[in-house]
Amino acid sequence: MIMNTFEDLFSEYAGRITDTVNEQESVFIQYCKLFSSIITDSFYVLDIVQKQFCYIKPDNLFLCDHSVEEAMRLGHDFYTQIIHPDDLPLWTNILKIIPQYLDRKDKWNEIDYFSCTLRLLRKYSFSSHFLSQMVYQRMKPICLNNNLRYLICIVEN
C-alpha cells in the first residue's frame, strides 16, 4: 500500500523536477525522507537519464562510510567506490538490461521489481583492508511518458 502511494506521488512530481529549488522536488524529497524514516533498509532514488541520485537515505549500509554529499556529487560513479570490483560488471549489466527489458512494453505488467545480490566494500577501523558485505538490492522502475526514468532502490543485508 505504501509503495503504491509512493509511486503515485513519485510519478506526479518526478516528471517536473528540474532543479533543487523546485517546489515539486522539495515535496518529493520530503516524501522520500518520510518514507525512508519508516523503513529500516537503505533507500535511494536513481535518475537513470541523468545518472544522478535524486535522494539517498543517510544510512551507512548503502553509503559504506561515504557521505550523502559525496554520493550525490559522484552520481552514477559512486557505485565504483562501493561495489566490489568483481561485482561491478554485474551491476553495470543490470543497469543496461533493465531499460532494454522495459523497452518491450508488453513486459511491463510482468515486472514488479528487479533484484540482485552483490558485495559492497566496507572499511572497518579494525582492518587496513576493505571487507566485503553481501547485500540484496531491489529496484522498482518508474517510467514517465512510457520511458524508464527512475529506479527506487532498497538495499538490505
What do these predicted ranges mean?
Residues 13-19, 26-27, 51-54, 61-62, ...:
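N-terminal start-of-chain detector that recognizes signal peptides
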Residues 1-3, 10-11, 44-51, 55, ...:
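Short low-complexity stretches enriched in small and charged residues
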Residues 67-130:
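PAS-family sensory domains
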Residues 1-42, 133-157:
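PAS-family sensory modules
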Residues 46-47, 121-123, 157:
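Acidic/polar residues at beta-strand termini and the immediately following turn/coil
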Residues 53, 128, 140-144:
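Short acidic, gly/pro-rich beta-turn/loop elements at beta-sheet edges
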Residues 42, 52, 117-118, 133:
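Conserved beta-strand and immediately adjacent loop positions that scaffold enzyme active sites
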Residues 20-78:
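PAS-family sensory domain signal
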